[in-house]
Amino acid sequence: MNVGIMCGSSDTASMESRLNNSRAVSEIADMGYTFVMGAGETGSMRDVKEIIRENDNMLITVGNRLELNRTTADVKIEVGSTFERAGHIYENSDVIIFLDGGTGTLSEFCSFLNNKIETDDKNKELVVVNMDGVYNKLIDDLKRKYKEGLASNTLTYFKEVRSPLELKAYLEEVEKKINGSEQERERVR
């Protein structure tokens, strides 16, 4: 299963944020997934990639030429913009995890959520890792928009988890669902 990870790349992020992101990834790093990420090598992105590499997971990175020259990965995909990067991460992932991050992470979540709604994409799973309530305001705002008729019930298009163990359990569910779908397709052939 390919797991996209979206997280902050700022070296000025709080230690608490970086540790929470690392704890979440440490919990799933031994599950044999292929991870898909931006090519940045700073902040939480660097921390997360170190955990992925230490566990010998396959890593696909997406970024511009300069970023790709500074990173090590099993597969490198060169793109010209952050929009292209996000699109490649979306397309190359079965599930996308949103860890604590900055405006880029929030923007990508909103973009991916909107795409999932607009295309009725039932094959892509979006997961918000809401440890310490870092996404509470965003989720509350989505609830408000639905209540006021400004948006559909967007909460049905992503899963919120609050701990690394809950993340691991949900990814196991998703993997079973994907494997079941693949087995069903093979049976029909």
Task: Show which residues each predicted segment covers.
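Amphipathic helical hotspot of TIR/SEFIR-family domains
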Residues: 106-116
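Acidic/glycine-enriched connector segments
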Residues: 39-108
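Glycine-rich, charge-decorated loop segments at or immediately adjacent to ligand/cofactor-binding or catalytic sites
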Residues: 42-47, 134-146
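Short, acidic/small-residue loops that bind anionic groups at enzyme active sites
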Residues: 60-63, 99, 116-139, 151-156
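Glycine-rich beta-alpha loop segments
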Residues: 1-59
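A glycine- and small-aliphatic-rich helix-loop capping segment at beta-alpha/alpha-beta transitions
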Residues: 53-55, 114-119
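A charged, well-structured terminal subsegment
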Residues: 95, 148-189
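Short, charged/polar "capping" segments at the starts of alpha-helices
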Residues: 13, 67-70, 134-138
